[in-house]
Amino acid sequence: MPHLTVTVSTMARSSSSRDISFETDFSSARIRWDGPRATLFLDGVESSAVDTSDPTYLEFEYMQHMSVIVHSWLGTLRRFRALHVGGAACALACAWSGQYPQSRHVAVEIDGTLAARVRQYFPIPKAPQVRIRVGDGRGVLESTREGTFDVIVRDAFAAGVTPGHLRTVEFARQVRRVLSPSGVCLVNCAHGGPANARQDVAALQEVFPFVATIQDPKVGRGGRRGNVVAVACADGVVDADNIDRALRTLALPARITRPTELKRWVAGCPPLMDEQIDYPSSP
């Protein structure tokens, strides 16, 4: 979707009284500290969690799931280029930068004030390891050369939902264009209430030969709101069996929903198109 003269993170480790609140370009933000760990809230919703003593630590389950996919996909390789559509505190970019020092990350954050503040308050590696680019994720994709990135992560939300122009078939086409041939797209989809992850998955299925998800069965059935992680790529790029085995070793075990089963879950839900949201598609 994360350098004052006196380092705020150092002061904040000792007391929750060091919690920080500030206004950004689009939201009200708060950083809550618990020892070395900080959670960024935007308009009261958890957005990022960072451990300043161990940036490879990932609090959120969906980020752990994405990391399992990337680790399986990489194999023995350690160098890759990642685009994160949605920056916030850059938790995933920081974790992967720590785990894979040869990797390079661009985090796109539409909120310029937020981008400046997270650089101020969190130990985010400097460019070229992690570069924060202020702008709209769709616009950045459309201006990026074909095959530039090996991993593209979409983890962008406003008021708890992903903006429509980041959920359409046309957006998915731009993602595939910018991905390297053996690259992977990882999408954090909200599901439940006003959010329908089936629509996000349907858009990916229109564009990518292989689409799978990681989801809690209760979330998939609509019993409660939660995250659905989608992975999209060319055939043969990821090993679903390997990913499934790794997911089962997590503190909270999970499983992969494979393409055939996923098609049944999505059946009857058409994908979102640019014209439905009056978004001007690129040529």
Residue positions per predicted region:
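A generic structural signal for alpha->beta connector loops
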Residues: 28, 102, 127-129, 182, ...
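Short polybasic amphipathic segments
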Residues: 38-43
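Conserved class I S-adenosyl-L-methionine
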Residues: 163, 189-206
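Conserved Class I S-adenosyl-L-methionine
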Residues: 172, 198-218
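Conserved beta-strand signature within the Rossmann-like core of class I S-adenosyl-L-methionine
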Residues: 182-189
